[in-house]
Amino acid sequence: AAVDRFGKIDVFFNNAGIVGKAAPIVEQDATEFDKVMNVNTRGVFLGLKHVLKVMIEQKSGSIINTSSVAGLMAWEGIAPYVASKHAVAGLTKIAALEGAPYGVRVNSIHPAPVETMMMRQLESGYNPDDPEAAKKGVEQLIPIGRYADPQDIANLVLFLASDESSFISGAQYRIDGGMAAK
């Protein structure tokens, strides 16, 4: 539909994610695991499958996949989410290699927690009696001391979508408020 309307696809921001229920692996439900993997990993795969084909044919384009800092490390209690976001990081690298000979760039962004409804749900899962305490606990893991603002993410996506990043592909960008420095 996009190609029919606009003639080509210049940029694809492959951004979707759910956390699922917070629980140790031994308490995780396989159905819940599959649900998280379907949205977070299969969704990215399907986006790549269809958009990468178009971009390879047109010999240009930029794809930005959203993973998470959890896709570069481990985070107790959200194993399905962590596994799904590690998979996104791997898919990004493969797509970058496959797209590079055709002028298609593929990168991943790895945000720390972002001020969104998804984080409110996760905080409630970690501490149903005091979600604000859960938020403060997560913020203590971030040296800057706060969640990312959606605009923080948008700024990096705009850079990766632009010609200013024409020699960048297969990269993993952390937007983590200093978490990697610890």
Language model regions located:
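C-terminal helical subdomain
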Residues: 108, 130-164, 168, 177
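Active-site helix of classical SDR
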Residues: 48, 84, 92
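Short, small/polar-rich loop/turn modules that mediate ligand/substrate recognition or access, typified
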Residues: 100, 105, 168-170
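Residue(s) in the substrate-gating loop at a strand-loop-helix junction
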Residues: 68
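Substrate-binding pocket helix/loop in short-chain dehydrogenase/reductase
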Residues: 23-25, 32-34, 134, 138
